A protein has these predicted regions:
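Domain-level signature for soluble enzymes in the chorismate/prephenate branch of the shikimate pathway
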Residues: 1-113
Length: 113
């Protein structure tokens, strides 16, 4: 969270944490938010492979992958997060989702759909 942003009610900023327990509680809260957002993203990936099946499109679209990485790096820089960290995380996530899409597409094609 940017230093000038106000914390939502009940949420401590890093500077407001007075103990390691409070820091860990906030990290756990942030982790829940991250997983919830990954679940939301996965819903879109789920829809993407269905559309790709209809359009006979590939799961792996390198230009799109790079476009996503470039956007994430820019957002990271704006937020003061190391762009290399976010790129590494997103490349891992994109790779996992590509494999997921490929398995789904292969399963549907083999099933004759």
């Amino acid at each position: 969270m940017p230093p000038d942003a106000e914390s939502p009610i009940g949420v401590r900023s890093p500077a407001d944490c007075r103990s390691l327990t409070e820091v860990r509680t906030e990290i756990d809260r942030v982790d829940r938010v991250l997983v919830t957002r990954i679940a939301e993203r996965m819903g879109y990936v789920e829809r993407a492979w269905q559309l790709k099946l209809d359009q006979k499109a590939e799961a792996n679209v390198p230009w799109r992958n790079q476009q996503v990485i470039d956007k994430v790096r820019a957002i990271a820089a704006e937020e003061g997060v190391p762009p290399d960290l976010c790129e590494a995380l997103w490349r891992q996530m994109i790779g996992w989702f590509i494999q997921y899409e490929e398995e789904k597409l292969r399963g549907q094609i083999e099933a004759g759909k």
